[in-house]
Amino acid sequence: MSYDDATFAPDGTDILTWLKDLSAAEEFFDALGVTYDPKVLNTSRLHIMKRMGQYLVAEDFSDLPTGTAATRARAALERAYRDFATSSPLKHRVFKVLEDRDPTKAAAPIQVFVPLEELLQPSEISDCGGVATQRCHQSDKVVAAPDALE
């Protein structure tokens, strides 16, 4: 479907500026003429809109006639909707909180912070059943220190 400039920006504003004034996901679908299943939209609205934004950022809208820009915006919304109409938001993981909890990715290594004061304190090394141990002052944990008694 093709749109003329007057369809989207009767006051002369470009399509992206016009879209920024919309707030509800349904408004985007209605404005761009994209049909949708309310059940899919209710389940994945934020994911669809975020993905549409990702697709729009990848497009170059500079110097495009409004009708052409509107057609591209419509295609971005249709593509984003299709992504979530056929699979769950967990599959696409568009939000950082879901991306960080992706079970298919290796967990980030845990970084342990040891304050300088901890390093400068004298250590408490003792022989515990033939194994040298050291007590951590900060966490009060006992850790093996096999080379400490040599």
Curated annotation (Swiss-Prot):
- Which Pfam family would be a valid example here? NifW
Q: Does the keyword Oxidoreductase apply?
A: no
Any idea which UniProt keywords this protein has? Answer: Nitrogen fixation, Plasmid
Q: List the disulfide bonds.
A: none
Q: Name one GO biological process term.
A: nitrogen fixation
The record, for InterPro entries, names: NifW
**At the top level of its lineage, which domain of life is listed?**
Bacteria
HAMAP family named in the record: NifW
Q: What does this protein do?
A: May protect the nitrogenase Fe-Mo protein from oxidative damage.
Family indicated by similarity: Belongs to the NifW family.
Subunit annotation: Homotrimer; associates with NifD.
Q: What is this protein called?
A: Nitrogenase-stabilizing/protective protein NifW
Source organism: Sinorhizobium fredii (strain NBRC 101917 / NGR234)
